[in-house]
C-alpha cells in the first residue's frame, strides 16, 4: 500500500489559537488521530486524559504540543502526516470500533498494519459502499460538516413506483416528521420490474437520510450503496477492499474545501 510522503500544515483560524501558538488540547489530540474533537471532549469528561499525571478537566486547556499528555495512561505520539483511505464497507458491518451486540465492525474487516484510522461519517449496518478513513481528526471533522459542502452520492434499489418528476421535487428539500433535509439531486436510472434504481447526491449526512426520504416517497429500499464522497469513488474496490489516496490527490482536494 503506498505511503503518504508529504505533510500539509493546516492554517488555524485565529479564534482557535492561543498566545504563542497555543492550541486547545482537544484540537491537538484530534489532529494526532486519537479521536474526533467531540470524542476527545467525551474522553476528557470521562477522566481518560492527563497532563503530567494530572487529570485534564476541560477541552479548552491550551498547549503548544502534546508532551506530557497521556490517554488511558499511555503517552500520545506527535501528529504524523495526514493520510486518507478508501474502504468499501460491506453490508452487515457496524461503523464503530466495537459493538455491544457483538456484530462485525469495520475494524474487523480492515487489514493489519494500517495506522489508527477514524471513519469520516457513518454508514448504517446494511448500507454498503465508500467509507473514507483518516488518521486526522481535524480532517474528519472538516469533511463531515454540512457547511463544507462535500457531496455524497448513493445508488439505491427500491421497491415501488416513483416518477422522475417526484424525484426532481427533492431539489427543493423536504421536511419529514419535523426534520428538514436539504436539496437532493435525484435521478431515476432504470426500472427492473417493480424495483427502481435511483441515484441521489446530497451535501449533508443526516442519519438514514436516503432511506427516510425514499420511504417518504412510498419506496422501500432493498439495497443502498454509497458510490462517492466528494471526488473519491468506489472505482476498483471490492467489498472489504481498502487503499490509500495519494498525497497529491488529498492535497488538491483540501484546496477545494470551504
Predicted regions and their residues:
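Basic, flexible Lys/Arg- and Gly-enriched helix-loop patches that mediate nucleic-acid binding at interfaces
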Residues: 2-258
Amino acid at each position: 500500500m503506498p505511503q503518504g510522503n508529504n505533510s500539509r500544515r493546516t492554517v488555524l483560524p485565529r479564534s482557535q489559537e492561543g498566545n504563542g501558538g497555543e492550541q486547545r488540547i482537544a484540537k491537538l489530540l484530534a489532529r494526532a488521530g486519537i479521536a474526533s474533537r467531540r470524542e476527545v471532549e467525551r474522553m476528557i469528561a470521562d477522566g481518560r486524559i492527563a497532563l503530567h499525571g494530572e487529570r485534564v478537566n476541560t477541552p479548552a486547556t491550551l498547549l503548544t504540543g502534546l508532551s506530557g499528555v497521556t490517554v488511558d495512561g499511555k503517552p500520545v505520539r506527535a501528529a504524523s502526516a495526514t493520510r486518507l483511505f478508501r474502504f468499501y464497507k460491506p453490508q452487515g458491518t457496524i461503523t464503530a470500533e466495537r459493538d455491544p451486540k457483538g456484530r462485525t465492525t469495520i475494524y474487523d474487516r480492515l487489514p493489519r498494519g494500517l495506522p489508527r484510522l477514524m471513519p469520516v461519517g457513518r454508514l448504517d449496518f446494511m448500507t454498503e459502499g465508500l467509507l473514507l478513513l483518516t488518521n486526522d481528526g481535524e480532517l474528519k471533522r472538516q469533511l463531515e460538516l454540512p457547511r463544507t459542502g462535500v457531496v455524497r452520492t448513493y445508488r439505491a434499489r427500491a421497491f415501488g413506483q416513483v416518477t422522475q418528476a417526484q424525484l426532481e421535487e427533492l431539489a427543493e428539500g423536504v421536511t419529514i416528521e419535523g426534520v428538514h433535509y436539504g436539496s437532493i439531486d435525484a435521478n431515476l436510472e432504470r426500472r427492473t420490474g417493480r424495483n427502481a434504481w435511483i441515484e441521489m447526491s446530497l451535501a449533508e449526512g443526516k442519519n438514514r437520510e436516503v432511506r427516510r426520504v425514499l420511504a417518504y416517497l412510498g419506496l422501500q429500499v432493498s439495497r443502498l450503496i454509497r458510490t462517492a464522497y466528494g471526488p473519491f469513488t468506489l472505482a476498483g474496490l471490492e467489498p472489504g477492499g481498502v487503499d490509500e489516496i495519494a498525497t497529491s490527490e488529498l492535497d488538491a482536494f483540501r484546496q477545494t474545501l470551504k
